[in-house]
Regions:
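Amphipathic alpha-helical packing elements
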Residues: 1-24, 182-197
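Short, solvent-exposed secondary-structure boundary motifs
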Residues: 37-45, 59-69, 111-125, 139-145, ...
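Short, exposed beta-strand/loop patches in secreted or surface proteins that constitute
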Residues: 49-53, 76, 126-132, 152
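Short, hydrophobic/aromatic-rich segments at coil-to-beta transitions
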Residues: 27-34, 54-61, 132-140, 161-162, ...
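Flexible, processing/modification-adjacent segments and terminal tails
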Residues: 86-143, 173
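Gly/Pro-enriched, hydrophobic low-complexity segments
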Residues: 139-225
Length: 230
């Protein structure tokens, strides 16, 4: 059944899924990544982190700070309609956000970060696909309370060039384009995923200002029973 659904997809969509999953339809949905990079919070801070996600939930735990120092503990997460962001220095909490706006924004982030878990994007897993052009494909699926429409720019081989979606930013701003440019990819067994990205609000517009740069240096497909370490 999964193979039949795959065959019925537009060619650019098949090209991406075949490239990302090696043509397999039995892959696990959830992955764990080892990430390092830098994030702009006023100044640029370097981080080391672990991310888990499946396109419908995520957990990101990071240690961040200037230079070699990693003074900040960061935990962003989303699952089952609820999102939160917690930042602390040792036991001193600096940020503790878990309101409705945080949850809606985190749902959009969970969908965009599915480029790291392509096993979660197969059509038999509730994802509706269409091709906008030979080099742009669109995936839509439910990430309650949102239903994001994720646009992927792809190359001739199906490699991801960018990911973009309208993501909730807050009651004042509403939905704003958020996305990432992809500079490198790598294969980890059957999966081929972006491994060097820059991301930010206003993607695809003159207002784009990346504030997050990340490099993936490890990937593990997790058993079905594993959930985010919330």
């Amino acid at each position: 059944m999964a193979e039949m659904e795959h065959a019925a997809l537009d060619e650019p969509v098949r090209r991406y899924l075949t490239h990302a999953t090696g043509g397999r339809t039995d892959l696990g949905r959830r992955v764990r990544l080892q990430l390092h990079g830098r994030v702009k919070v006023g100044a640029w801070l370097r981080f080391d982190s672990v991310w888990e996600g499946d396109g419908r939930s995520f957990s990101w735990r990071a240690r961040a700070g200037p230079g070699p120092l990693r003074l900040l503990d960061v935990h962003d997460q989303f699952a089952e309609r609820r999102g939160s962001m917690h930042v602390a220095i040792r036991r001193l909490t600096l940020v503790d956000a878990h309101d409705e706006d945080t949850g809606r924004s985190a749902a959009g982030r969970a969908a965009l970060e599915a480029i790291w878990a392509p096993g979660a994007l197969l059509p038999d897993r509730g994802v509706d696909w269409r091709a906008a052009s030979d080099s742009e494909i669109v995936a839509t699926w439910a990430v309650p309370p949102e239903r994001p429409e994720v646009h992927l720019g792809i190359g001739p081989d199906g490699d991801v060039r960018f990911a973009r979606a309208m993501r909730w930013r807050g009651r004042r701003e509403g939905y704003v384009a958020f996305g990432a440019d992809v500079y490198e990819e790598r294969s980890f067994d059957a999966l081929t995923v972006p491994t060097r990205i820059s991301a930010g609000w206003g993607h695809g517009t003159a207002e784009w200002s990346p504030f997050f740069e990340a490099n993936v240096h490890g990937l593990e497909v997790l058993p079905v029973q594993n959930k985010p370490n919330c």
